[in-house]
């Protein structure tokens, strides 16, 4: 076959199919064009155990599952499951640590083979815990420990995260629990001799220090552990004692909020006495051989959540968290630090989606990867490597994900993935409801409220994904990088259903303005014909600011409630919509000013307009997203009345660097002086900061669950000696 024919086949297949063939495959297949098999989901990777990776993908018609993979220094291996299916999974074993693997997917249909382009995964990000050989038993006698461990895991349902064995003795219960679960187990006891013997036994078996650690404490009444961290607390010595060691006060202090479980064995009388100071927090039940006291810790008081890009569906950048009254960094303490690090992400500049947090969990996006963590101790719950996940320049778009109590919803190419927030498993797939758009459009904004998810359609290539080069700093005041991503339809789907409840189509919807409150969905759209004719998904013509309407729909039915023609200053730099206290606030940034507008959420009538100069025209000072606390909307450096637009204050503490603002009831969190992560106490107007800690260039530090969460987002910065690790902070008086 001549080279011209080979190139023709390559070019044709690249256009028609979801695949690009290698030279070897072209030589093998000759003139035969394969029958296309569409990938509904491109292959993605999840790690379940060290040294292994499972690849998943979905096709439109059944076929075998075939993977070819290898590292840069190894020959490719081929794995095939011949059973035809549409939901594919292949488990790869024997993988090296800290290694990038390339892989491709081959499908066969009617005797023809189609091979995808190369994808990659990096085992550096296999954060799974090392399993313990179940045949091991370094202890001389079992004494019912195995049965106790099995009962504890079965009755509590806690099998991962951190376990504290309170009064751990020689560590036998700690060993049995670790062997049967993915728990990282810490044992503590005031008996130094028992701790020493346990360390020797576990060290001799090669088990000490990885999954199991034993510590000595002078008193079990005051152990050397931070509060609110342990997913599971049990007791070794209580299994075989007439009196339960220590105090229930200390156990409850250390127990993780929002679902942490204490499960302590003893006699009926000993447990009744032990829980007496906290009787309302425990239940006591009879088992086969003993009684068990159980406590499930509630959420911290007045703890909020961060379920959407700017906190919630109102886009008010406020989690509703009180942080126990804390308004300064010196009123917070480090709760945990660790993974992921800077290598997990892209860089601080491209302005990626914010981390999200809800129901005791934290979620963070990196370079085509996403992970779930326990927000109170940093334990890694799961990690996915997902081609097509990446979205950047969020100030000019909507984020690609949101949360509810149990699921993470991610807009990935033309689909919405519903992922179990505890396990990372893909539970449900939503496709664009208009089948005719699935070849030309992608899923745009991603929001959820109650029983519905909300999405939009954006022309393919509309969302920003470029993260390399000067233009990818996205700090521009005009031109490339400031063009707004817009959707040509908006829709709602009931969770776990497939068909849309309703679809709205009229003008071009500015993604960054879509807001939901009180069962209504609000947005700004342009109905200008020139703007609507743009077929890139990013509207780069000035006509986007003409023929604009503020629109309100019934979120349940899609019924038009009202629409109002508006004429604001052009939002060349950024353009946002926020709901607060029956008002809709439009933020528009145009050199050299911010413009803030107040509209009635009842009918869209304009109530007020205020403006002020930018603090500067670079490093994010010209593109801040507003934050609302109480009756005040803050937009650097001002605070305005939500109701009237009256300037209430102009003393917002100095902000430096490219990051926007997150709010609690008592403080604003942003990048303060010397470019550190800072808190501005709203009442005292005082700024405090953490040394050597910086955020990303948009939003990577959020308050949630009674904490401040800072998954690493500042990697790549050269303007300081920064700590490039993830951290969680808890109020220092939360004990």
Model-derived regions, located:
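Short, surface-exposed linear motifs at loops/turns and structural transition points
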Residues: 25-131
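Repeat-blade elements of multi-bladed beta-propeller folds
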Residues: 347-370, 392-417, 438-490, 506-550, ...
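A short acidic, Gly/Pro-enriched loop at the edge of an enzyme's catalytic core
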Residues: 220-232
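Short loop/turn segments that connect beta-strands within beta-propeller blades
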Residues: 375-377, 420-424, 494-497, 554-557, ...
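Low-complexity, Pro/Ser/Thr- and charge-rich linker/hinge segments at domain boundaries
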Residues: 123-148, 298-310, 440
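Conserved SAM-binding strand-loop segment of SAM-dependent methyltransferases
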Residues: 206-220
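A short glycine-rich, Lys/Arg-flanked "PGG" loop and its adjoining helix->strand segment in the class I
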Residues: 243-260
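Conserved class I S-adenosyl-L-methionine
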Residues: 158-175, 182-186
């Amino acid at each position: 076959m001549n080279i011209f024919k080979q190139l023709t086949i390559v070019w044709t297949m690249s256009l028609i199919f979801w695949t690009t063939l290698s030279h070897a495959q072209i030589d093998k297949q000759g003139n035969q064009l394969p029958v296309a098999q569409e990938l509904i989901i491109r292959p993605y990777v999840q790690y379940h155990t060290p040294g292994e990776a499972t690849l998943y993908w979905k096709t439109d018609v059944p076929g075998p599952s075939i993977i070819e993979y290898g590292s840069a220094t190894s020959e490719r291996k081929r794995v095939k499951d011949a059973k035809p299916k549409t939901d594919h999974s292949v488990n790869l074993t024997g993988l090296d640590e800290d290694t990038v693997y390339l892989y491709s997917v081959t499908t066969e249909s009617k005797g023809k083979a189609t091979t995808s382009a190369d994808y990659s995964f990096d085992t550096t990000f296999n954060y799974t815990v090392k399993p313990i050989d179940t045949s091991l038993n370094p202890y001389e006698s079992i004494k019912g420990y195995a049965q106790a461990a099995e009962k504890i895991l079965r009755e509590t349902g806690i099998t991962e995260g951190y376990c504290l064995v309170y009064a751990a003795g020689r560590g036998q219960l700690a060993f049995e629990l670790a062997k049967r679960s993915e728990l990282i187990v810490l044992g503590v006891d005031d008996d130094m001799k028992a701790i020493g013997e346990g360390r020797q036994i576990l060290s001799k078996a090669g088990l000490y220090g990885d999954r199991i650690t034993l510590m000595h404490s002078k008193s079990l009444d005051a152990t050397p552990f931070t509060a609110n961290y342990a997913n599971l607390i049990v007791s070794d010595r209580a299994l075989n004692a007439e009196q339960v060691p220590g105090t229930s006060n200390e156990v409850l202090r250390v127990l993780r909020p929002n679902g942490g479980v204490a499960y302590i064995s003893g006699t009926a009388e000993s447990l009744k006495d032990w829980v007496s100071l906290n009787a309302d927090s425990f239940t006591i039940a009879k088992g086969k051989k003993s009684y068990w006291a159980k406590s499930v810790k509630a959420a911290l008081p007045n703890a909020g959540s961060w379920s959407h890009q700017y906190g919630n569906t109102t886009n008010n950048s406020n989690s509703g968290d009180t942080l126990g009254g804390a308004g300064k960094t010196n009123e917070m303490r480090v709760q945990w630090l660790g993974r992921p690090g800077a290598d997990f992400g892209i860089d601080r500049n491209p302005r990626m989606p914010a981390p999200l947090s809800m129901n005791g969990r934290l979620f963070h996006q990196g370079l085509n990867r996403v992970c779930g963590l326990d927000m109170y101790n940093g334990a890694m719950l799961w990690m996915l490597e997902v081609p097509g996940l990446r979205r950047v320049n969020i100030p000019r778009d909507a984020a690609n994900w949101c949360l509810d109590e149990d699921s993470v919803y991610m807009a990935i190419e033309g689909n919405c993935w519903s992922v179990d927030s505890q396990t990372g498993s893909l539970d449900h797939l939503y496709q664009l409801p208009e089948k005719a758009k699935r070849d030309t459009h992608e899923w745009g904004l991603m929001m959820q409220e109650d029983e519905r998810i909300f999405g939009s359609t954006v022309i393919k290539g509309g969302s920003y994904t470029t993260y390399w080069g000067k233009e990818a700093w996205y700090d521009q005041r005009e031109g490339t990088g400031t063009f707004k991503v817009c959707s040509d339809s908006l829709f709602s789907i009931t969770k776990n259903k497939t068909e849309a409840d309703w679809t709205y189509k009229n003008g071009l919807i500015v993604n960054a303005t879509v807001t939901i409150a009180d069962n209504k969905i609000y947005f700004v759209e342009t109905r200008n014909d020139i703007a609507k004719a743009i077929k890139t998904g990013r509207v780069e013509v000035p006509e986007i600011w003409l023929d604009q309407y503020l629109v309100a729909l019934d979120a349940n039915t899609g019924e038009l409630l009202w629409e109002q023609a508006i004429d604001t200053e052009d939002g060349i730099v950024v353009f946002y919509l926020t709901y607060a206290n029956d008002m809709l606030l439009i933020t528009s940034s145009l050199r050299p000013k911010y413009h803030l507008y107040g509209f009635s959420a009842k009918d869209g009538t304009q109530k007020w307009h205020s403006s002020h100069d930018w603090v500067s025209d670079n490093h994010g000072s010209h593109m801040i997203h507003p934050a609302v606390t109480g009756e005040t909307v803050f937009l650097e450096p001002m605070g305005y009345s939500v109701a009237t637009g009256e300037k209430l204050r102009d003393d917002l503490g100095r902000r430096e660097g490219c990051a926007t603002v997150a709010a609690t009831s008592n403080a604003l969190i942003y990048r303060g002086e010397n470019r550190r992560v800072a808190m501005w106490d709203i009442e005292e107007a005082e700024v405090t900061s953490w040394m050597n800690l910086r955020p990303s260039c948009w939003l990577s530090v959020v308050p949630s669950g009674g904490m401040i969460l800072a998954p690493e987002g500042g990697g790549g910065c050269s303007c300081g000696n920064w700590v490039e690790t993830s951290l969680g902070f808890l109020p220092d008086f939360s004990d």
